[in-house]
Amino acid sequence: MKTLRILPFLVLLPFLSCSSSEDEPTPTPAETMYFPNNTDNNWETKSIASLGWNQSAVPPLKDFLAEKHSKSFMILVNGRIVMEEYFNGHSATATWPWNSTGKTLVSTTTGIAQQEGLLNINNKVSQYLGNGWTSEPLEKENLITPRHLLTMTSGLNDESNWVIKSNLTYLADAGTRWSYSNVFQKLIDVVAASSNQTFENYFNAKLKNKIGMDGFWNFGTIFTIYHSNTRSMARFGLLFLNKGKWKNEQIINETYLNEAISTSQDINPSYGYLWWLNGKSKYMVPGSQTVYPTALVPNAPADMYAAMGAEDQRIYVIPSKNMVVIRMGDASDPQNPNFALSGFDAALWDKINAVVR
């Protein structure tokens, strides 16, 4: 009798299982992150239509970019090119200066040197450059670490962009004052000294060649600026979107990367390790001690972080959308060029938001 009671239930099981499987929708697999090859120009694309974005808002975006003196513009989603546009005589093979956007290359190379045990960003800078690299009293100079250079809190006088010893005078104790200045360039010397080779050689071997970038450094008397094509800038943005990993190789460890794109001090919470951070309660800008009580770009995604350079060079990384946005070009407002943040950011995001939905 026990067998007779159990059998009908067992017979029903396959049908119940079948019915459940047919009623439930098949989950859509998450799209994998794509990485272009390092050896050719092939790069997968993805259409705006396939993303469900607003195609009719693309022409106004392109018109805006052209009118604002842009040279190039790219959007990547999961590493695939959704938009790639060139303007005002520029081309895919032409190089363009990154300006201060390249500070993030220095930050990243510094992090790689730390993960290789060549330096520690919490040690004294003088441990790598020797005593007397500034004109400060030794007890004040010894307060400065590479971390202070990464966070713009060295306390050194910021009146001159020319980073020579006579200009590096005391203004405040390290860590007590945020001020955007060129003294971050001393990180280039720290990496060179700790790696026992030129910064450029170390950068090429540990970062540039690993992710297939092109380009070169121009070490000028005052400014040190990286130049490359637009896709090389996009490759670097993609590396950060994928948390420092390129294909199967961890180029920069996640611990340092997360520090770099997080608030690094409480004076200007919108600043990491030479990266700008959106979604914070306040921010400061180059050349001013004014504190603005709002997010960096209020109409952009709150989780966005950005590399920002003079004349509106931009890398925007938006993890929540698996998206990287690149803009290279001349200043959007030639009469009022800015070193970093400008009104261009909010205006551009108005146009991007009309496309991305």
Question: What do these predicted ranges mean?
Answer:
Residues 1-16:
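Sec-dependent bacterial lipoprotein signal peptides
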Residues 16-91, 96, 114-119, 151, ...:
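N-terminal leader/targeting segments and the immediately adjacent pre-domain N-terminus
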Residues 64-74, 85-129, 142-144, 171-178, ...:
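Short active-site loop at a secondary-structure junction
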Residues 79, 96-122, 149, 186-191, ...:
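Active-site SXXK
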Residues 83, 321-330:
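Short, well-ordered beta-strand elements
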Residues 116-154, 195-229:
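Active-site helix/loop module of the DD-peptidase/beta-lactamase fold
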Residues 212-319, 333-342:
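Penicillin-binding protein/beta-lactamase superfamily catalytic region
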Residues 326-357:
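C-terminal/domain-terminus segments
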